[in-house]
Amino acid sequence: MSVNMEELRHQVMINQFVLAAGCAADQAKQLLQAAHWQFETALSAFFQESNVASAQHHQHMMCTPSNTPATPPNFPDALAMFSKLRTSESLQNSSSPASNACSPPGNFNPYWASSPPNQQPVWLPPASPTAHLHHHHHHPQPVWPPNSQPTGGPQKAMAAMDGQR
């Protein structure tokens, strides 16, 4: 009975390994046997082996893991794919549906949340005494610190602001 339990335990470990690593059952069995059925050791060996294999550009046939949280994508390959995508996008004309789907329209305004220049912003009430200050672009800019202003500076600024009211 213990032999059957041992075989069952091994089969369960093989199945778990296949799910965790995304490889074939025969490869999982070989790795587990080589690691004396130590699951973590076999899993570590599998991922070290897959890193070596990808560095050697897949010289021998091997089952690569699926893209799971435990197995991030191969970043050099992903970067190469993105650079190819960028190159192919620049070769297309701007009227193609693919480039239109990936690019903003020609009249795209990054300040879409700001109000139009000739309309009052929505967040200020129309009767606000300061609303007119947002539409006149000739009012003087404040100078800081106040000590650096020439004499009469504060009076000039106040007179200019009073003149706008």
From Swiss-Prot:
InterPro entries: UBA-like_sf (IPR009060), UBA_8 (IPR054109), UBALD1/2 (IPR039310). SUPFAM superfamilies: UBA-like. Pfam families: UBA_8. Signal peptide: none annotated. Residues 119-165 are annotated as: Disordered. Belongs to the UBALD family. This is UBA-like domain-containing protein 2-B. It comes from Xenopus laevis (African clawed frog). The gene is ubald2-b.
